[in-house]
């Protein structure tokens, strides 16, 4: 059999002998929940003479690769934008057969119709197979999962069989349950072919099936930090057999605050392990983690060294105001849904916005579903399945799905709310244009996001994208201190209204209505402050004054159609007026805008006209 051979016969039955190091027949310990995850775990003081030695260098350079000159290697790396740092880095493989994987692995690769390794696979496989620690920095959708899974299979095949009570040989830590499940789906097919066992453990799902998998013994465990900490604390599994550690999307795990849990977990693993860290960015926090966990590692970077987006994505930025987003989204979805390939992810900032927007769109007949962290695992799995199979081609999501969500045919990404950082922006739009395909990303950028405008322009320029002139204007206004309106951009909607008739903005003159009040309901109430601090209220939709208007201590009722009552003006005189009085004074001795007496407007269907609040 070509490829890597080992003394492990996967066909023979596995007997349960005496437990080796790391195992116990005493059964699982009863555990309790703690406020500080992992505080029950004690850092192990490793004596490397105690556990058995293990082999981690299995790399056999293919003859075709050995004949390749240094100049040819450099030309290939330059063409694929591969940057390598570290000593004695192996040459990249240009074809699958040059990696010398076992025949059953090659059969699965052939069934999946892969033509050639991606850039991160070409350079990452020789490094991982050599037993070296490595850091891989590459954009989303670049094939990172197979970059560490296939060398893991080779590594496992050269280790002794698991005994009862042994933990996994390969541990993959992932930031979210969605990413963990996707890694498990990729691993499952290769594990079946190689007669290995894998499992996925994550929060939000029943513990029973996950515990049974661990007790039966698995070579590969894909886990989120929180659930793994739970199982380690109560003795459901252990990591003393773990010799191959993968930190997938390390930057995301740090963003989510998992660093203490990661350190607790790594303390349970023998220090002579092989460690592979994968990330889409290379901030100082990730660099520090690499320095702490990795030894003499090889750093592989795919693409530009600075923050960069996938160049296969067309990025379109629309500078607008918050109240315009809904209408713009509907117009955009009408165009997208007319396309044959129309699978779309809409990213929003909050869980509440996700639920509200999902309800609005479904109410108006759009095939949309929402996903965020507060939904149950069963509901999240169902929503993702419906989205993947095209039954609901519009997915509205918070950042819980912005990384690791691997759906091959996502054609469009819409940033309804701009994220908090350009790193998150790059990860969001990276849900499209997976595996060398193309895609389009639309972004609604408001003046409230002005702090991110410079970084966004840098990302657009690096990817050779057209830059909206309004973005450049925001930078100019911000730099010169000429910021106008809320958030630094002039509110040009006011120019569409003549003086005294800005019903969408002010009831009375702007300066004297500075501290007006608004309600958040569809029927907007405008308030004008009087001398004594009371407020009048005008219902925007039916043209009538509401009840209980108070001015200078006098309570007066205003009713639709024929308002009568008393009103005290700025000269402390009281006048009686009826329905035909043309000029009312507002307590500040200024002319009030006369609302037309119109019939009540019907409920406005979504999307709402620009004259109404959105």
Swiss-Prot record:
Domain Helicase ATP-binding span(s) in chain numbering: 125-300
Phosphotyrosine carried by residues: 297
Top-level taxon of the source organism: Eukaryota
Modified residues (Phosphoserine): 24, 480, 520
EC numbers for this chain: 3.6.4.13
Keyword rRNA-binding: no
Localization terms from the record: Nucleus; Nucleus, Nucleolus; Cytoplasm
InterPro entries named among the record's database cross-references: DEAD/DEAH_box_helicase_dom, Helicase_ATP-bd, Helicase_C-like, P-loop_NTPase, P68_rpt, RNA-helicase_DEAD-box_CS, RNA_helicase_DEAD_Q_motif
Chain positions of cross-link Glycyl lysine isopeptide (Lys-Gly) (interchain with G-Cter in SUMO2): 32, 45, 53, 340, 343, 388, 391, 411, 437, 451, 470, 523
PTM characteristics: Sumoylated; sumoylation, promoted by PIAS1, promotes interaction with HDAC1 and transcriptional repression activity. Sumoylation also significantly increases stability, and reduces polyubiquitination. Polyubiquitinated, leading to proteasomal degradation.
Region annotation (Disordered) ranges: 1-46, 477-504
Compositional bias annotation for Basic and acidic residues: 1-15, 488-498
Covalent link (Glycyl lysine isopeptide (Lys-Gly) (interchain with G-Cter in SUMO1)) residue numbers: 53
Broad class of where this protein is predominantly found: nucleus
Entry binding sites for ATP: 114-116, 121, 138-145
GO biological process, one term: estrogen receptor signaling pathway
Function according to Swiss-Prot or TrEMBL: Involved in the alternative regulation of pre-mRNA splicing; its RNA helicase activity is necessary for increasing tau exon 10 inclusion and occurs in a RBM4-dependent manner. Binds to the tau pre-mRNA in the stem-loop region downstream of exon 10. The rate of ATP hydrolysis is highly stimulated by single-stranded RNA. Involved in transcriptional regulation; the function is independent of the RNA helicase activity. Transcriptional coactivator for androgen receptor AR but probably not ESR1.
Assembly, per entry: Identified in the spliceosome C complex. Component of a ribonucleoprotein complex containing mRNAs and RNA-binding proteins including DDX5, HNRNPH2 and SRSF1 as well as splicing regulator ARVCF. Interacts with RBM4; the interaction occurs in an RNA-independent manner. Interacts with AGO1 and AGO2. Interacts with ESR1, AR, EP300, CREBBP, POLR2A, TP53, RUNX2 and HDAC1. Self-associates. Interacts with DDX17. Interacts with BRDT. The large PER complex involved in the repression of transcriptional termination is composed of at least PER2, CDK9, DDX5, DHX9, NCBP1 and POLR2A (active).
PANTHER family per the UniProt record, alphabetical: ATP-DEPENDENT RNA HELICASE DBP3 (PTHR47958)
Family the UniProt entry places it in: Belongs to the DEAD box helicase family. DDX5/DBP2 subfamily.
Listed name of the protein: Probable ATP-dependent RNA helicase DDX5
Protein source organism: Pongo abelii (Sumatran orangutan)
Species lineage: Eukaryota, Metazoa, Chordata, Craniata, Vertebrata
